[in-house]
Amino acid sequence: INEYSASNCDNDGSDCGDYEDWIELFNNSQEPVDLQGYFLSDKIDNLLKWQFPNSLILQPQDHVIIYASGLNPDLEISSNETSFKLSQTKNNEYIILVSPDFTTIDYVQLSRHKLNHSIGRTFDGASDWSVFSESSPEGSNTGSSISYKATPYFNYDAGFYENSIELNINCDDVNVDIYYTLDGSIPNTGSNFYGTIDQNGNIQLSEPGLVLDNTVVVRAIAISQDNEYLNSFVETNTYFLNQEHTLPVISLAGSQVDNLLYGNQIRPI
C-alpha cells in the first residue's frame, strides 16, 4: 500500500464515473505480481472483504490504482472497483492487503486529510508516511509534507449564550500564525490576524480577545511557518448570542452550502 485518498474530487478514472476514493499499490520487488486472488479490506474484523476477481499483473517498481467505489458486488465485476468505500469519519477505518493464503501483507489506518490531498509513503516503498497536497495516483510519491499543523480551538464551545463572550483562540503547536473570519468564509493570510505561536510555544496576540456581542460564525486556521508542514484544518464554531429558540438548531458554514441545499452535487464544504 503506497498511497490513498478518501477525499478525491479531482481524479476520475473509475468505471462508475464518479470521483471515488482510491488506493495505490506499488510493487517494490524485482518480480511481477499477479494480484488475482489477493484481498483488500477496510476493516480489521473482516480481512477478506473484497477479492481481486481477475488477473492483474503489477510489474516491478510499478503502480496500480484501485477505486474504493463501494459498487454492489452483485453488479458486473471489475478488477479495480472494490465493494467498500473509505471513510475519514470512522476511527476503525483501515486499508488492508491480504494474500491468497490469508497472510496480511500490509495495512495502514486511515488518517484525516483535506480535499484532493492524499496520504502516502514519503517516497515509493518507504516505511514512513506523509501528507501530499498534490496527490500522485499511479505516479511516484514526491513533494511530501510531514503532517498538518494542529487545529486551533476556542475557549467557548459553540452554542447559545445569554450575554456577550470574550473568545480566545489557541493552538497546541509551534511556528504558526492564527487567522480567523467572522463571515463563515475559510480563513487565509488575508483574513483577520489573531496572533503568532513561536518555536517555544509562546503566543503573541495582535489583540487581547474577541468580544462577541451578536450571533456569529467564527472560523480559525493555523498557517504553518514551516515548509515541512501544511496548514491546519479549519475549526468552526457558531455562537448564538441573546437568541431564543424552541426548535433544535443546525448551523452550517461553508462556501458551497448552496450546492448542497439545491442538490447540485455532493462535495465537502
Region locations from a protein language model:
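Activation on beta-sandwich/Ig-like modules and their edge loops
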Residues: 1-129
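Short, compositionally stereotyped local motifs that mark structural "simplifiers"
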Residues: 4, 57-60, 66, 113-269
